[in-house]
A protein has these predicted regions:
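Feature activates predominantly on carbohydrate-active enzymes
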Residues: 1-119
Length: 119
């Protein structure tokens, strides 16, 4: 996303890869990984949410180490494809459908809240 019209008084322009918020959708796109790797996505009410929910939003299983690896590879690809990009923001969706798998639940209990599973 292009933020070139940012006023110079505030640091000038900058470009963000794949938008400034709610971008799990692009970090680990369900179209690319959902069928083969449903375990990359949030487990809610016994079902893997390997598809967009609430419109375009996606929740990930953040205790799955492969999720971070896939996200990092995708970010690196975006930055290589557009060297003028200044930054990449990582932001979870605003949904109540966070992952409730055993590992994410253990993290939640350890740190005291559901938002801790979105670390």
């Amino acid at each position: 996303r292009d933020y070139r019209n940012k006023d110079e008084r505030h640091g000038g322009c900058f470009r963000i890869a794949k938008g400034p918020a709610h971008n799990y959708r692009w970090l680990v796109a369900p179209e690319a990984y959902g069928a083969q790797h449903p375990e990359y996505y949030a487990l809610d009410d016994g079902k893997r949410l390997n598809y967009p929910i609430r419109g375009n939003e996606v929740e990930l299983c953040l205790s799955n180490p492969n999720v971070a690896q896939v996200a990092a590879e995708n970010i690196a690809g975006w930055l290589r494809a557009d060297p003028d990009t200044d930054m990449c923001f990582i932001g979870q969706s605003d949904t109540p459908s966070y992952c409730k798998c055993d590992n994410c639940e253990a993290t939640r209990k350890r740190y005291g809240g559901w938002d801790s599973t979105r670390r």
